[in-house]
């Protein structure tokens, strides 16, 4: 890796951090909260439970103050749907409404701008039982929830509708790490993505019809796919992977339809896996109307993939332990993930490749010139860390600093090349519960002792605090 240092940021560039309600709040049975899909699934299938997680439900003031004290100007967080509507068809929960008002007011008091997601991997259990995003009736339920939040939380000026559509659908219907734990159901995964893109479009239209002040968009986790070499079949496999993971979503968001090229390659993948998806009459009309009304876009980036052609039985191994070499991914007619010599990986087998971030930002600029302002809404790396011996000891996470610096450098380089990107959010503010890894996968700028809930400062937080402004 090149030797570089980021010492200063543009004056108007936002530096923030990110969380998600279910991963940090805890308090899963408090103040009338309803049941979401993880409450049931984890109780039945996991040794890890998300209570108290990082205890953010009670410690939000402390955590937001820590963010402000260390130079973070924005906080990405999400609202728990089942706190607001314990019964998704019932009345709003006043206690939850008051709670989120307090959280947002705390952000504003500390001069931390709240960027709020409505859905972050946490559908209500009743929604899951009725098909989750595969059931179009649940789109109507989501719009009801979105409308309520848009109108109620007027202190929020930055709204994201749905977080990481493909990550959610792939976790539910390809890898099976997320409820309902289905495997290699391509029809379900692609249909869920299309329906979420439609739900996002309807929420954007609702936002503007209501005359809400602020910005609105969605968040995609984009992962560039590179052929492992110059062989024609591997180039084609990388192309198909890109369509599946990136272009399908970007077309639907910024164009409001799927290009001929996208549909051609997507159909090749679907046909090879005896799968299909349905675009109903009127869907693309709605998506086209909404596309130019996106006023911001959230991009999450952690890794790129190197692809080799694969034709055979679908297989995926998920690394849930942090022991290198346990993960694999092989999807018929899409490709196989392979390691490229010289590219480092995390303990969870994620490639560390900052150039992929730069390439994707430039690509969005070139292929979707109508795109709105971009925020890198998640970027960070997980480490295995232990509680320090002294009460005031600083945890040395130099590897995290290096990771952040490399990626932030690429963001600023892309910005210099004309990409309209105006912020960078580190995942995550504090250590938190991981959906499929429990508590040993630590991303935070602040270490959480889960037994006492004490926060310890990491070196990365001090590094962030030391960044200057041009």
Curated annotation (Swiss-Prot):
Any one GO biological process:
lactose catabolic process via tagatose-6-phosphate
Where is the catalytic site? 164 (proton donor), 378 (nucleophile)
**Record's GO cellular component, any one?**
cytosol
Q: Does the keyword Ribonucleoprotein apply?
A: no
Which GO molecular function annotations are given, in alphabetical order? 6-phospho-beta-galactosidase activity; beta-glucosidase activity
Pathway(s) annotated for this protein in UniProt:
Carbohydrate metabolism; lactose degradation; D-galactose 6-phosphate and beta-D-glucose from lactose 6-phosphate: step 1/1
Residues annotated to bind D-galactose 6-phosphate: 23, 120, 163-164, 300, 434-435, 441, 443
EC class (word)? hydrolase
- Its Enzyme Commission number(s) read 3.2.1.85
Listed Gene3D superfamilies:
Glycosidases
Q: Residues of the signal sequence?
A: none
- Recorded catalytic activity of this chain's protein: a 6-phospho-beta-D-galactoside + H2O = D-galactose 6-phosphate + an alcohol
Key words of the record? Glycosidase, Hydrolase
Keyword check for Hydrolase, yes or no.
yes
Q: Which InterPro entries match?
A: 6P-beta-galactosidase (IPR005928), Glyco_hydro_1 (IPR001360), Glycoside_hydrolase_SF (IPR017853)
Please report which protein family the annotation says this sequence is part of.
Belongs to the glycosyl hydrolase 1 family.
- Alphabetized NCBIfam families for the sequence: lacG (TIGR01233), PRK13511.1 (NF010036)
Q: Which HAMAP family match?
A: LacG
Q: What is this protein called?
A: 6-phospho-beta-galactosidase 1
The lineage is: Bacteria, Bacillati, Bacillota, Bacilli, Lactobacillales
UniProt lists the gene as lacG1
């Amino acid at each position: 890796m090149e030797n570089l240092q980021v010492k200063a940021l543009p004056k108007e560039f936002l530096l923030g951090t990110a969380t998600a309600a279910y991963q940090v709040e805890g308090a899963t049975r408090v103040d009338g909260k309803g049941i979401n899909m993880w409450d049931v699934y984890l109780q039945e299938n996991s040794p890890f439970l998300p209570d108290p997680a990082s205890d953010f439900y009670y410690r939000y003031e402390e955590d937001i103050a820590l963010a402000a004290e260390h130079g973070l100007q924005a906080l990405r967080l999400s609202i728990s749907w089942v706190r607001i509507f314990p019964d998704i068809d019932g009345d709003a929960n006043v206690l939850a409404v008051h709670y989120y008002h307090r959280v947002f007011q705390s952000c504003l008091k500390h001069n931390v701008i709240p960027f709020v997601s409505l859905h972050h991997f946490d559908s209500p259990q009743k929604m899951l039982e009725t098909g989750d995003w595969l059931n179009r009736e649940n789109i109507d339920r989501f719009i009801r929830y979105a409308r309520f939040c848009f109108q109620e939380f007027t202190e929020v000026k930055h709204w994201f509708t749905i977080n990481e559509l493909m990550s959610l659908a792939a976790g539910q219907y390809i890898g099976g790490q997320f409820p309902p734990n289905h495997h290699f159901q391509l029809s379900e995964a692609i249909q869920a993505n299309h329906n979420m893109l439609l739900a996002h479009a309807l929420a954007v239209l609702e936002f503007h019809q209501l005359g809400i002040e602020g910005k609105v968009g969605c968040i995609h986790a984009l992962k560039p796919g590179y052929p492992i070499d110059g062989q024609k079949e591997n180039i084609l496999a990388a192309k198909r992977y890109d369509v599946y993971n990136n272009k399908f979503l970007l077309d639907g968001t910024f164009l409001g339809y799927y290009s001929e090229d996208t549909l051609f390659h997507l159909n090749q993948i679907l046909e090879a896996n005896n799968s299909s998806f349905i675009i109903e009459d009127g869907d693309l009309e709605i998506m086209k109307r909404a596309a130019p009304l996106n006023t911001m876009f959230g991009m999450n980036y952690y890794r790129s993939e190197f692809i080799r052609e694969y034709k055979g039985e679908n297989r995926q191994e998920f690394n849930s332990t942090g022991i290198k070499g346990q993960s694999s991914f092989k999807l018929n007619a899409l490709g196989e993930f392979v390691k490229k010599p010289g590219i480092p990986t995390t303990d969870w087998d994620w490639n560390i490749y900052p150039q992929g971030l730069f390439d994707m930002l430039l690509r969005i600029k070139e292929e979707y010139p109508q795109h709105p302002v971009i925020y890198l809404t998640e970027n960070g790396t997980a480490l295995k860390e232990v509680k320090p011996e002294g009460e005031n000891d600083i945890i040395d996470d130099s590897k995290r600093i290096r990771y952040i610096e490399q990626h932030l450098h690429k963001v600023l380089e892309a910005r210099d090349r004309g990409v309209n990107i105006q912020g960078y959010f580190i995942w995550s503010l504090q250590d938190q519960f991981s959906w499929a890894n429990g508590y040993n996968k630590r991303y935070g700028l602040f270490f959480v002792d889960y037994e006492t809930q004490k926060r310890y400062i990491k070196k990365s937080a001090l590094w962030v605090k030391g960044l200057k402004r041009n």
